[in-house]
From Swiss-Prot:
Cofactor binding note: Binds 1 pyruvoyl group covalently per subunit.
Localization, UniProt: Cell membrane
Cofactor: pyruvate
EC number: 4.1.1.65
InterPro entries: PS_Dcarbxylase, PSD-A
Entry protein name: Phosphatidylserine decarboxylase proenzyme
Secretion signal, residue range per the UniProt entry: none
Residues with site note (Cleavage (non-hydrolytic)): G187, S188
Residues annotated with Pyruvic acid (Ser) modification: S188
Chain segments annotated as coiled-coil in the UniProt record: none
One of the record's GO cellular component terms: plasma membrane
Species this chain originates from: Citrifermentans bemidjiense (strain ATCC BAA-1014 / DSM 16622 / JCM 12645 / Bem) (Geobacter bemidjiensis)
Keywords from the named record: Cell membrane, Decarboxylase, Lipid biosynthesis, Lipid metabolism, Lyase, Membrane, Phospholipid biosynthesis, Phospholipid metabolism, Pyruvate, Zymogen
Length: 219
């Protein structure tokens, strides 16, 4: 996979460069033409700062051993329960995490394992807090298999605002627990499907930190 360790996610560079260039241009026009460019220049400066903040890519310290499942996303737990995962048609323990525009949007591998399958589904753009988003929204999923042979599914779900999913991983890749593997732009949701028997360690409404918050222990 590509290098994903830059302090600002590389997907943010074009946005940052564009807003910064607009800020500089408007400031220069205001200086030399003595026109009212202060307000738009300030607006683009604020957009530049927010975009840097949005695409921040901090280091994380991953706890536990290889049976410890860590959160793949920063955000808030909005669903817990047993469900049938539609791609594999298997029954899993599902945890859904909602990412607001203020969360870090870089996604991390919840376990160490091999990507044995990947899928992309076009779809709608419901608000990701609506449970229909898990089944009907645009999404990118990975099926991971651990060294012990356990399988789980992690799905990036696009939302009402977030309509650009980035996934660096592909079938055949090996992921390390806590390693960055993708992101979703501007507010989104991530669904993780864990094997039955996993001991779940989070509750509804709990805040999560990608790569650090323990979601559960594999059976």
């Amino acid at each position: 996979m590509r290098n994903t360790d830059t302090p600002i996610a590389v997907e943010g560079y074009p946005f940052i460069a564009g807003f910064a260039a607009a800020t500089l241009l408007l400031a220069l026009l205001g200086q030399f033409l003595h026109c009212g460019f202060f307000v738009p220049a300030t607006l683009f400066f604020v957009l530049t700062v927010f975009t840097v903040f949005f695409f921040r890519n901090p280091e994380r310290a991953t706890p536990g051993d290889e049976n410890t499942v860590v959160a793949p996303a920063d955000g808030e737990v909005i669903f817990l329960g047993k469900v049938i995962e539609p791609h594999t048609n298997g029954e899993f323990e599902k945890i859904s995490i909602f990412m607001s525009v203020f969360n870090v949007h870089v996604n991390r591998a919840p376990i160490s394992g091999k990507v044995v399958d990947g899928f992309y589904t076009k779809g709608k753009f419901f608000d990701v807090r609506d449970e229909r988003a898990s089944f009907e929204n645009e999404q990118q999923g990975l099926v991971l298999e651990t060294a012990a042979g356990l399988r789980m599914v992690v799905v990036q779900v696009a939302g009402l605002i977030a309509r650009r999913i980035v996934c660096y991983a592909k079938t055949g890749d090996s992921l390390s627990r806590g390693r960055r593997y993708g992101l979703i732009r501007f507010g989104s949701r991530l669904d993780i499907y864990l094997p039955l028997g996993t001991s779940i360690d989070v509750v509804m409404g709990q805040k999560t930190v990608a790569g650090e918050t323990v979601l559960g222990i594999l059976p």
